[in-house]
Amino acid sequence: MTDYVTDIAVIGAGPVGIFTVFQAGMLKMRCCVIDALSEIGGQCLALYPEKPIYDIPGYPVINGKELIDSLKKQSEPFNPQYLLGQVAEKIEDYSDYFLIRTTTGIVVQSKVIIIAAGAGAFGPNRLPIDNILDYENKSVFYQVRKVSDFCDKNIMIAGGGDSAADWAVELSKVAKQLYVVHRRKNFRCAPNTALQMDNLSQSGKIKIIVPYQVKKLCGENGKLHSVIVKNITNHEEMALQVDYLFPFFGTSANLGPILNWGMEVKNYQILVNAETCLTNRNRIYAVGDIATYPGKLKLILTGFSEAAMACHHIYHVIYPNSPLNFQYSTSKGIPENC
């Protein structure tokens, strides 16, 4: 029994997956989008909704939530079907269509598959502390959903990469006290961000605690009141008053069932033809961060371009006897009866 029938099944509802809906719609192809998360947006919305993005054409700066909202609005005329909280588990190839089965038993029939799953399913790298689960989503968070929620609070950021440094700069604007704890004296972040952190440290807006690491969380009922940190050189410990802790140690990605679909994979990325984004499997494409080829740039705008290339190639697969006369969107507008 088939629950949904579509032209293209898009695996992943991040920015590139949503833009794929628009590109397909401009060619009068319907999309059904499958994503494991409970809302569209992928990592862009789940991890960085208020983090500024500077390399989207036409936007001097835009945050993750604003970008996803704009992409969603842009794709709405094409009435995509979103299947959220669903993992595409198995695919069955019937020569001219696929059946895609999700972990909850939903079956989607699709002529073509486009994988736009970013880094795949992902989760945070946790601190090795026994009781950290007691505090997660209460006073320990792995993303900043809304900066204003942390106004006038004592905040600790643990980590030394770009995410830790970027959010230290952003949260210093609203925090009562902000600690940045790192096991090394040097931060692995953009030079300009490192300079900003240094200036904020000198002005007292940020207290940089190095070379230390988080040792213990203290509180009750999931609410922190202090964090004990330990010097990794002389083993000295100190307790710092903390309301919220943000461990920024990156995420662990897992392609999950996609690894079993027969595509060529290298370093957890799917190898594709650079001109069409076609994988080694007929009628299965990959775009965005999950796709790779010589010279690939892992940028959102690169994924947008790949979505357009894939959809134009797919048109000839779905409509082999119907020529595609290329037109700019300014000429043809939004197709009707999509």
UniProtKB/Swiss-Prot annotation:
It catalyses: 2 reduced [2Fe-2S]-[ferredoxin] + NADP(+) + H(+) = 2 oxidized [2Fe-2S]-[ferredoxin] + NADPH. This is Ferredoxin--NADP reductase. Gene3D superfamilies: FAD/NAD(P)-binding domain. FAD binds at D35, Q43, Y48, A88, F122, D289, T330. Its cofactor is FAD. The keyword NADP applies. Its EC number is 1.18.1.2. HAMAP family: FENR2. It is an enzyme of class 1 (oxidoreductase). Coiled coil: none annotated. Homodimer. Belongs to the ferredoxin--NADP reductase type 2 family. SUPFAM superfamilies: FAD/NAD(P)-binding domain. Binds 1 FAD per subunit. Keywords: FAD, Flavoprotein, NADP, Oxidoreductase. One of its GO terms (molecular function) is flavin adenine dinucleotide binding. Pfam families: Pyr_redox_2. The lineage of its organism: Bacteria, Pseudomonadati, Pseudomonadota, Alphaproteobacteria, Rickettsiales. It comes from Ehrlichia chaffeensis (strain ATCC CRL-10679 / Arkansas).
